[in-house]
C-alpha cells in the first residue's frame, strides 16, 4: 500500500507537469472505486491547476472551482503520459491537460478514491486527522500528551491517523527498530527519552524514504515508472527470519492489530509487566 513517502513522491513527480496547466477533460472509466466517483469532478474542466498538495495520504489538485482529492488505496498509481497513449486495463481516470499530457490513474484493486471538494470546504475524509509527521507540530511534547496513560501498544498508536498522519506499516516498523522500541510496548509506559528518540526517528525514516522515492514492494512505482529505492534501506520490514543488521539475531514477525509487524527481539527488548 502506498504510504506517506510514496504519496509525497507522487506529488513531487506530477507537480511540474500539472502546475499552471488547464484541464481539458476528465475521463472516468468506472463508476466506483472505494466510493462512487462524483460527477462534480467535471466542474474542474476548463480550470487552471493552481497547486498540488498532500494531506496525510491524500493528494489535492486545486483549481479556482474546487479540488480533486485522490487516494491511491492499496494498489493505485499515477503516471504522466502523452495524451495519445491508449488506456490499459485498470486505467480508471484520466485528467487530460491542454498541453497534450494526461495524468492517468491506474488501480487494479479499486480501493483508491477520486473525490471532489468545493473551494473553502474541508472534505469529510480530511477531518479529524492528526498533524503531519514532518512538521514542528509533531514533537515529543505533543506525543507525550497524547500517549499519557494509554495502554495501546506503540505500533498501533503511531499508525493512528488521529495521532499523527502517514506513519504506515512499513515506516512504523522501521522507526521503532531505529528507536530500539519493541512494537508491543504500551505507549503510556514510554520514557520521555524514548519518546524523543522515536519522534526523531519517525521524521528521519520518512525523510529518507521520500529522498529515495518511496518503497517499491509490489504495486508502487514513481510517476515516471521507476521503482522507489527505500526497499533497499529496510532493516526489519519484510525480513522475518533474516539477521538483524545490528546484532545478527533473527528478525521476528507477528500480527499486531491485524498488520504484519517486524522487529529484533534483542535490539527491541520488551520489558515484562
UniProtKB/Swiss-Prot annotation:
Binds 1 zinc ion per subunit. Gene3D superfamilies: 1.10.8.50, MutM-like, N-terminal. DNA binds at residues 90, 109, 150. The active site is at residues 2-3, 57, 259. GO terms for molecular function: 8-oxo-7,8-dihydroguanine DNA N-glycosylase activity; class I DNA-(apurinic or apyrimidinic site) endonuclease activity; damaged DNA binding; zinc ion binding. Its cofactor is Zn(2+). PROSITE patterns: FPG_CAT, ZF_FPG_1, ZF_FPG_2. GO terms for biological process: base-excision repair. A zinc finger (FPG-type) spans 235-269. Pfam families: Fapy_DNA_glyco, H2TH, zf-FPG_IleRS. It catalyses: Hydrolysis of DNA containing ring-opened 7-methylguanine residues, releasing 2,6-diamino-4-hydroxy-5-(N-methyl)formamidopyrimidine; 2'-deoxyribonucleotide-(2'-deoxyribose 5'-phosphate)-2'-deoxyribonucleotide-DNA = a 3'-end 2'-deoxyribonucleotide-(2,3-dehydro-2,3-deoxyribose 5'-phosphate)-DNA + a 5'-end 5'-phospho-2'-deoxyribonucleoside-DNA + H(+). Its EC number is 3.2.2.23, 4.2.99.18. Keywords: DNA damage, DNA repair, DNA-binding, Glycosidase, Hydrolase, Lyase, Metal-binding, Multifunctional enzyme, Zinc, Zinc-finger. Belongs to the FPG family. Monomer. PANTHER family: FORMAMIDOPYRIMIDINE-DNA GLYCOSYLASE (PTHR22993:SF9). Involved in base excision repair of DNA damaged by oxidation or by mutagenic agents. Acts as a DNA glycosylase that recognizes and removes damaged bases. Has a preference for oxidized purines, such as 7,8-dihydro-8-oxoguanine (8-oxoG). Has AP (apurinic/apyrimidinic) lyase activity and introduces nicks in the DNA strand. Cleaves the DNA backbone by beta-delta elimination to generate a single-strand break at the site of the removed base with both 3'- and 5'-phosphates. This is Formamidopyrimidine-DNA glycosylase. It comes from Aliivibrio fischeri (strain MJ11). The lineage of its organism: Bacteria, Pseudomonadati, Pseudomonadota, Gammaproteobacteria, Vibrionales.
Amino acid at each position: 500500500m502506498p504510504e506517506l513517502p510514496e504519496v509525497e513522491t507522487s506529488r513531487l513527480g506530477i507537480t511540474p507537469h500539472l502546475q499552471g496547466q488547464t484541464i481539458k477533460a476528465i475521463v472516468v472509466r468506472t463508476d466506483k472505486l472505494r466510493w462512487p466517483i462524483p460527477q462534480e469532478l467535471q466542474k474542474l474542466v476548463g480550470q487552471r491547476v493552481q497547486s498540488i498538495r498532500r494531506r496525510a495520504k491524500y493528494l489535492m489538485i486545486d483549481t479556482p472551482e474546487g479540488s480533486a482529492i485522490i487516494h491511491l488505496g492499496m494498489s493505485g498509481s499515477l503516471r504522466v503520459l502523452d495524451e495519445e497513449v491508449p488506456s490499459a486495463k485498470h486505467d480508471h481516470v484520466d485528467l487530460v491537460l491542454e498541453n497534450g499530457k494526461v495524468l492517468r490513474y491506474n488501480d487494479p484493486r479499486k480501493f483508491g478514491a477520486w473525490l471532489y471538494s468545493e473551494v473553502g470546504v474541508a472534505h469529510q475524509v480530511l477531518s479529524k486527522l492528526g498533524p503531519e509527521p514532518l512538521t514542528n507540530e509533531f514533537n515529543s511534547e505533543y506525543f507525550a500528551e497524547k500517549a499519557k496513560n494509554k495502554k495501546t501498544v506503540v505500533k498501533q498508536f503511531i499508525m493512528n491517523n488521529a495521532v499523527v498522519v502517514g506513519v504506515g506499516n512499513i515506516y512504523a516498523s522501521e522507526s521503532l527498530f531505529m528507536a530500539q522500541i519493541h512494537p508491543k510496548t504500551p505507549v503510556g509506559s514510554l520514557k520521555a527519552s524514548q519518546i524523543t528518540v522515536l519522534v526523531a526517528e519517525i521524521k528521519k525514516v520518512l525523510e529518507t524514504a521520500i529522498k529515495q522515492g518511496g518503497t517499491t514492494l509490489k504495486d508502487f512505482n514513481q510517476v515516471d515508472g521507476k521503482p522507489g529505492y527505500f526497499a533497499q534501506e529496510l532493516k526489519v520490514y519484510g525480513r522475518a527470519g533474516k539477521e538483524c543488521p545490528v546484532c545478527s539475531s533473527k528478525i521476528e514477525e507477528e500480527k499486531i492489530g491485524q498488520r504484519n509487524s517486524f522487529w529484533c527481539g534483542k535490539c527491541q527488548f520488551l520489558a515484562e509487566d
